[in-house]
């Protein structure tokens, strides 16, 4: 099993932490296991509560059903259904930025 370093950051929320996340675990789940409190609601990729923005790196969020192609191209990611596929940095708490 491969594990990646995922940096979660949001200056306004006081978050600047790096977690280890296996490539078969959702980023939200890994963050919670490591004591990081991130927003979530459905945990199924069907809403935008957990939205973040990918600053660097790559993720697999093929399980999501909410974001459109343009939002994905802009780097938005649903942490509840995103697996890291490389080391990455995610700006958290980005639900409002979607609209």
Curated annotation (Swiss-Prot):
PROSITE patterns: 2FE2S_FER_1, 2FE2S_FER_2. It is found in: Plastid, Chloroplast. GO terms for molecular function: 2 iron, 2 sulfur cluster binding; electron transfer activity; metal ion binding. Binds 1 [2Fe-2S] cluster. InterPro entries: 2Fe-2S_ferredoxin-like_sf, 2Fe-2S_ferredoxin-type, 2Fe2S_fd_BS, Beta-grasp_dom_sf, Fd_pln. The keyword Transport applies. Pfam families: Fer2. Residues 4-96 form the 2Fe-2S ferredoxin-type domain. One of its GO terms (biological process) is electron transport chain. Keywords: 2Fe-2S, Chloroplast, Electron transport, Iron, Iron-sulfur, Metal-binding, Plastid, Transport. [2Fe-2S] cluster binds at residues 42, 47, 50, 80. Signal peptide: none annotated. Its main location: plastid. Its cofactor is [2Fe-2S] cluster. Coiled coil: none annotated. Disulfide bonds: none annotated. GO terms for cellular component: chloroplast. SUPFAM superfamilies: 2Fe-2S ferredoxin-like. Forms a complex with heterodimeric ferredoxin-thioredoxin reductase (FTR) and thioredoxin. Ferredoxins are iron-sulfur proteins that transfer electrons in a wide variety of metabolic reactions. Belongs to the 2Fe2S plant-type ferredoxin family. This is Ferredoxin. The lineage of its organism: Eukaryota, Rhodophyta, Bangiophyceae, Cyanidiales, Cyanidiaceae. The gene is petF.
């Amino acid at each position: 099993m491969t594990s990646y370093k995922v940096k979660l950051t949001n200056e306004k929320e006081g978050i600047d932490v790096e977690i280890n996340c296996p490539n078969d675990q959702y980023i939200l789940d890994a963050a919670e296991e490591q004591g990081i409190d991130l927003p979530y609601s459905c945990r199924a990729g069907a809403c935008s509560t957990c939205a973040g923005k990918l600053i660097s790196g790559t993720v697999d969020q093929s399980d999501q059903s909410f974001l459109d192609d343009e939002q994905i191209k802009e780097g938005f990611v649903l942490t509840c259904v995103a697996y890291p596929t490389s080391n990455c940095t995610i700006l958290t708490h980005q639900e409002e930025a979607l609209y």
